[in-house]
Amino acid sequence: MQHLVLIGFMGSGKSSLAQELGLALNLEVLDTDMIISERVGLSVRGIFEELGEDNFRMFEKNLIDELKMLKNPHVISTGGGIIMHDNFKGLGTTFYLKMDFETIIKRLSKKEREKRPLLNNLTQAKELFEKRQALYEKNASFIINAQGGLKKSLKQALQFIA
């Protein structure tokens, strides 16, 4: 079995689904944003503000190479922009959590949105969302309709794996 890699726009439920998949399949769960935050000692927002997005993307790209070296399969929850890296391909079996922009914004509280620097300007965030959708679809082994909530997303993911 390869890594099970969850991709999708920020707020689409990747972290929550990763936890549930990990439990269901008895696999360790890794979260790329959390790993980077712990290593740098700053939140993702802090990294963006103090070190810049380019440095965050460099940390992310280096982490992809590290994850490819792991022997055992993991469930990996990724940051929304991870698919922009040329070394992303081959990380594992990818599941795109597809959800419309309006639903994502409704799901995230104001406090949650404040943690995500790329959601500061909703017009720009929607443009980014639309730009990335094609990349998510292109890089997806499977597409999960995440509109129906966590239980339905988990059921779809497990059916794809079976």
Curated annotation (Swiss-Prot):
Pathway: Metabolic intermediate biosynthesis; chorismate biosynthesis; chorismate from D-erythrose 4-phosphate and phosphoenolpyruvate: step 5/7
Residues that bind ATP: 11-16, 116
GO biological process: amino acid biosynthetic process; aromatic amino acid family biosynthetic process; chorismate biosynthetic process
Coiled-coil segments on the chain, per record: none
Gene Ontology MF terms in the entry: ATP binding; magnesium ion binding; shikimate kinase activity
Keywords associated with the record: Amino-acid biosynthesis, Aromatic amino acid biosynthesis, ATP-binding, Cytoplasm, Kinase, Magnesium, Metal-binding, Nucleotide-binding, Transferase
UniProt catalytic activity: shikimate + ATP = 3-phosphoshikimate + ADP + H(+)
PROSITE patterns in the cross-refs: SHIKIMATE_KINASE (PS01128)
GO cellular component: cytosol
Binding sites annotated in the UniProt record for substrate: 33, 57, 80, 132
EC number annotated for this UniProt entry: 2.7.1.71
Intracellular or extracellular location(s): Cytoplasm
Chain sites annotated for binding Mg(2+): 15
Membrane-spanning intervals of the chain: none
Top EC class of this enzyme: transferase
Main location: cytoplasm
PANTHER family according to UniProt: SHIKIMATE KINASE, SHIKIMATE KINASE 1, CHLOROPLASTIC
HAMAP family the UniProt entry points to: Shikimate_kinase
Subunit structure: Monomer.
Function: Catalyzes the specific phosphorylation of the 3-hydroxyl group of shikimic acid using ATP as a cosubstrate.
Protein name: Shikimate kinase
